[in-house]
Each structure stands twice: as structure tokens, then as C-alpha cells.
């Protein structure tokens, strides 16, 4: 006894539906053109990159910022402490705050001037190192100048 299916047509499977849209637009073509150097062309400049400040210049700038921030922080802290200290006279804290602000602006200007002075020495030293491939012996003069500037700045 043979088995029969009952129909002569094969069973068709349903195709899965496509979930993304089909596009007939082609991707843009970017022709890669390579320039052939001619006999008169100049080679590309190797030093055309922008230079970042050196490590010592960044340290000097950071030190100047720390000094200014410290001065302002101490002044504000002293002012807030003076407000809550409970002194009987109101005019004395106001005068003291004005005097502290005057001292702070003077210190800030001095700190900025010293920071700028040492920043110049730091730039000179790092420039020398860059030009001489990091040779400290050649740049010792600039290193001594930077150390002297930093020592002078510590006294203030």
C-alpha cells in the first residue's frame, strides 16, 4: 500500500518578510588621486605641526594658577570666618575685608608677574631641549636660569 498526499502540488513555504528598506542608491565614489611628484615640487614640510607647550611651561602655568587660587581661597575663608566670629562691631569686619581684598589683588599681581617671569625661563629651557634633542648638558644654562627664577619666586 502506497502513501498518497492528496495533492499533486508541492507545499510552498512562506518567504520571510524583509524588515529594512531596500535602496537602489549607490554609495558615493571618491576617486583616490595620488599626486605624482614632479621634478620641481617641494617635499612636504615636516615642521608644519603645531607645537604644544613643554612640560616645564605647563608646570609654571599650573603653579601660577595654584598660587592665585590659594590666595583667593584664603581670603574668602578669612572673610567667611570673620562673618561668623560674632564680633560686636560691624564696621571692623567690612574694613578688614576691604584690606584683605586689596592685599589679595596685590599678591595676585605679584604672583602673576613671577609666574610670567619663570614661564619665560621655562619656555627657553624647553625650546633648547627641543632643538638639541633633549641634551641637558647643552641646555644647562637655561636650566640654571629656571632654577634661580623658581628659587626667587619661593621667597615671596
Swiss-Prot record:
One of its GO terms (biological process) is mitochondrion organization. A motif (Cx9C motif) lies at residues 118-128. Residues 84-110 have a biased composition (Polar residues). GO terms for cellular component: cytoplasm; mitochondrial intermembrane space; mitochondrion; nucleus. Residues 1-21 form a transit peptide. Residues 1-21 have a biased composition (Low complexity). Residues 1-50, 78-110 are annotated as: Disordered. Its main location: mitochondrion. Disulfide bonds join 118-149, 128-139. It is found in: Mitochondrion intermembrane space. Residues 115-156 form the CHCH domain. InterPro entries: CHCHD2/10-like. Keywords: Disulfide bond, Mitochondrion, Transit peptide. PANTHER family: COILED-COIL-HELIX-COILED-COIL-HELIX DOMAIN CONTAINING 2, ISOFORM A-RELATED, COILED-COIL-HELIX-COILED-COIL-HELIX DOMAIN CONTAINING 2/NUR77. Present with 6960 molecules/cell in log phase SD medium. This is Mitochondrial intermembrane space cysteine motif-containing protein MIX17. The gene is MIX17.
